[in-house]
């Protein structure tokens, strides 16, 4: 950091403070993780200087032979990791991956079925404030009031009634296993395409700990961070017959030059995910989530659907005076980073909410295991019980910091 500190001390100080936050705070945001030093090195490489519009072997710029090697590696590793016929590793984000699929397979005004955002879906699955809700006729499906799990009977009823061109599967706050085969069967009854957004569970899928959507969907999109533990970015996997249309929608359709330094980091992350250690890591993520959920229930917390099958859980404060916003702020003062989240059948504003979303991927990367999850549940319970007591929250933060010092993230140079 010496060169940066000299040239731009303001930015250098902000980076240093963020590094300390990641080291000593407890990161429980379900969509966040920590990349390896190898991924950091690739993303901070000289590849950031290279424009490479087009695809390997078919570029619009010269001097692309080295970045062609990198992108080809990323593509082949992605295909191997998920047993996919085709991979496009150029999307800058999961949202742009979803946009490319929509624009390649749909026309404006076409009907899509997507999971209700307040029930655990995602903005790009048809929210009216998002492009997906403006370009297409969206019919939302959700969870059962009784079980708070996806109501497949409702999905089938809506599909038969509205005859969607595409059914969008996937979520950003759904703690249970998704039955991709059931969605495929429903789609086949109405001749619909299936797009699965597996952004949150991609790492679990790669490790064989969640059923793969690949056999059941024409299109699968994902981010490359979250459980996959790569750089922030997106990717599309699809059947070979859609490869040309997907590629042309990414470039020149919605993007220009790909971010080759990020694609290099994706390639490195995919190689890491192909190692046996990655499956062990993902198993620990699931074990930690299960333990944390059980411990929170013991302490009187209500969890959406009663628990978790994957890496995340949703604390539900509906019916109480506690809001997600207040709980998030209290946890932050206690050195615990989480995010407020709507719960199914939400009655509060999305800026206030009745829930908190918690995930274990980042904490597991730090090295925390089941024993630490018991402590974490205690920290969360104490923080939520002491909303408004800054002195108590500061004391909890000291305990959190002491715990995290035992599990260093990056070796200090």
From Swiss-Prot:
<dbReference type="InterPro" id="IPR019798">
    <property type="entry name" value="Ser_HO-MeTrfase_PLP_BS"/>
</dbReference>
<keyword id="KW-0663">Pyridoxal phosphate</keyword>
<keyword id="KW-0808">Transferase</keyword>
<dbReference type="GO" id="GO:0004372">
    <property type="term" value="F:glycine hydroxymethyltransferase activity"/>
</dbReference>
<dbReference type="GO" id="GO:0019264">
    <property type="term" value="P:glycine biosynthetic process from serine"/>
</dbReference>
<dbReference type="InterPro" id="IPR015421">
    <property type="entry name" value="PyrdxlP-dep_Trfase_major"/>
</dbReference>
<dbReference type="GO" id="GO:0005829">
    <property type="term" value="C:cytosol"/>
</dbReference>
<comment type="function">
    <text>Catalyzes the reversible interconversion of serine and glycine with tetrahydrofolate (THF) serving as the one-carbon carrier. This reaction serves as the major source of one-carbon groups required for the biosynthesis of purines, thymidylate, methionine, and other important biomolecules. Also exhibits THF-independent aldolase activity toward beta-hydroxyamino acids, producing glycine and aldehydes, via a retro-aldol mechanism.</text>
</comment>
<keyword id="KW-0028">Amino-acid biosynthesis</keyword>
<protein>
    <recommendedName>
        <fullName>Serine hydroxymethyltransferase</fullName>
        <ecNumber>2.1.2.1</ecNumber>
    </recommendedName>
</protein>
<dbReference type="Pfam" id="PF00464">
    <property type="entry name" value="SHMT"/>
</dbReference>
<dbReference type="InterPro" id="IPR049943">
    <property type="entry name" value="Ser_HO-MeTrfase-like"/>
</dbReference>
<comment type="pathway">
    <text>One-carbon metabolism; tetrahydrofolate interconversion.</text>
</comment>
<dbReference type="InterPro" id="IPR015424">
    <property type="entry name" value="PyrdxlP-dep_Trfase"/>
</dbReference>
<feature type="site" description="Plays an important role in substrate specificity">
    <location>
        <position position="225"/>
    </location>
</feature>
<keyword id="KW-0963">Cytoplasm</keyword>
<comment type="subunit">
    <text>Homodimer.</text>
</comment>
<feature type="binding site">
    <location>
        <position position="117"/>
    </location>
    <ligand>
        <name>(6S)-5,6,7,8-tetrahydrofolate</name>
    </ligand>
</feature>
<dbReference type="InterPro" id="IPR001085">
    <property type="entry name" value="Ser_HO-MeTrfase"/>
</dbReference>
<feature type="binding site">
    <location>
        <begin position="121"/>
        <end position="123"/>
    </location>
    <ligand>
        <name>(6S)-5,6,7,8-tetrahydrofolate</name>
    </ligand>
</feature>
<comment type="pathway">
    <text>Amino-acid biosynthesis; glycine biosynthesis; glycine from L-serine: step 1/1.</text>
</comment>
<dbReference type="GO" id="GO:0030170">
    <property type="term" value="F:pyridoxal phosphate binding"/>
</dbReference>
<comment type="similarity">
    <text>Belongs to the SHMT family.</text>
</comment>
<dbReference type="GO" id="GO:0035999">
    <property type="term" value="P:tetrahydrofolate interconversion"/>
</dbReference>
<dbReference type="InterPro" id="IPR015422">
    <property type="entry name" value="PyrdxlP-dep_Trfase_small"/>
</dbReference>
<feature type="binding site">
    <location>
        <begin position="349"/>
        <end position="351"/>
    </location>
    <ligand>
        <name>(6S)-5,6,7,8-tetrahydrofolate</name>
    </ligand>
</feature>
<feature type="modified residue" description="N6-(pyridoxal phosphate)lysine">
    <location>
        <position position="226"/>
    </location>
</feature>
<keyword id="KW-0554">One-carbon metabolism</keyword>
<dbReference type="InterPro" id="IPR039429">
    <property type="entry name" value="SHMT-like_dom"/>
</dbReference>
